[in-house]
Amino acid sequence: FEVSELALYTIDMEIRDLLRRQKIEIIPVLGSITDGGLLTRVMAQHKVQVVLHAAAYKHVPLVEKNPIVGMSNNVLGTHTLALAAATAGVERFILISSDKAVRPQNIMGASKRMAELVVQDLASRSAGKTVFTMVRFGNVMGSSGSVIPLFQDQIAKGGPVTLTHREVTRFFMTIPEAATLVLVAVSFACGWDGIVLDESPPIP
């Protein structure tokens, strides 16, 4: 399920290539998490058991410049998706959140914290039919929007390298660690709780 046609096409081709010898049906759906009717129909039609909610605007400067759209997608979209999951009887709903939701310092972080509260509220009223939980990611090395590709590009162009502060410290997780965190949440979540990776030592 993806709102970007190019992103959906790309990931569909990648997954089909990886699973070309497996008899697994892949159904790409083009749509927005703000479309509650479509979400409910798709989940019910395909008997979806697990929802991994990673559809968020996460680039801090862009969300700062587009706060209404950022809040609409990250907060209202989360509410629409979580409600559709509960309505369709999905077994598990995993919200992919951010460490920026802790004492948020920007609009993106605030939107992720509000998304957590929205899902927590639905969890308290779901009567156990749908298990809601969340995982908080830090900086994922190599992911879209990660600072590492940005730094590499800036260095390749001869600098300067932009830092938020001279004394800044960043914690990183690898893509396999991030994937494992999500799988742990799917496997062991039994109610509203949060799962956070004990990340590697900070990189000063």
Regions found by a protein language model. Name each.
Residues 4-7:
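Helix N-cap at the beta1-alpha1 junction of Rossmann-like dinucleotide-binding domains, i.e.
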Residues 22, 27-50:
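Conserved Rossmann-fold cofactor-binding substructure of NAD(P)-dependent oxidoreductases
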Residues 18-23, 89, 125-128:
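Short helix-capping segments at alpha-helix termini
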Residues 29-30, 72, 165:
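Conserved residues in the N-terminal Rossmann fold of short-chain dehydrogenase/reductase
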Residues 28, 70, 132-135:
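Hydrophobic/aromatic anchor residues within beta-strands of the central parallel beta-sheet
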Residues 83-86, 107, 113-195, 200:
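NAD(P)-dependent short-chain dehydrogenase/reductase
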Residues 11-12:
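Conserved SAM-binding loop
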Residues 53, 57-60, 64-117, 121-122:
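Conserved Rossmann-fold NAD(P)-dependent oxidoreductase catalytic core, especially the SDR/UDP-sugar
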